[in-house]
Amino acid sequence: MVMLKISSFLAVYALVVCQMDSFQAAPVRPGLESITDRVTLSDYEARRLLNALVKDFIQMTAEELEQASEGNSVTAQKRACNTATCVTHRLADFLSRSGGVGKNNFVPTNVGSKAFGRRRRSVQI
């Protein structure tokens, strides 16, 4: 049984080896090789092609940088805080910026060195 398998394998191998002499190796891509051999560019055409490639590359790079800058432009925003302290501070900030509610009816408070509740200092020379 094993001899039959080995002999059949050897026979097939011998046939393949004999047939390989009749086949000649052909290029994998014969069309592409012949096209590249036939194409020749003049100096003017080569410069125009190079300029177009450089222009496209610069445009693509500029677009990528623009998209990156749009994604990274973070506007400064304060965190939202709804606690009573934050709301009070925001209201006080708004009132101080807008001029307050009773700006025209402003009465100055009695503050200073002689205001009620402050100790008087005795000045000794």
Curated annotation (Swiss-Prot):
One of the protein's GO biological processes: regulation of cytosolic calcium ion concentration
Propeptide part(s) removed at maturation, as residue ranges: 26-77, 122-125
Keyword Signal: yes
Assigned keywords, A-Z: Amidation, Cleavage on pair of basic residues, Disulfide bond, Hormone, Secreted, Signal
Residues recorded as bearing Phenylalanine amide in the entry: F116
Primary subcellular site in the record, as a coarse category: secreted
Claim: Secreted is one of the keywords in the record: yes
Similarity-based family: Belongs to the calcitonin family.
Name of the protein described by the UniProt record: Calcitonin gene-related peptide 1
Species of the source: Gallus gallus (Chicken)
Gene assigned in the entry: CALCA
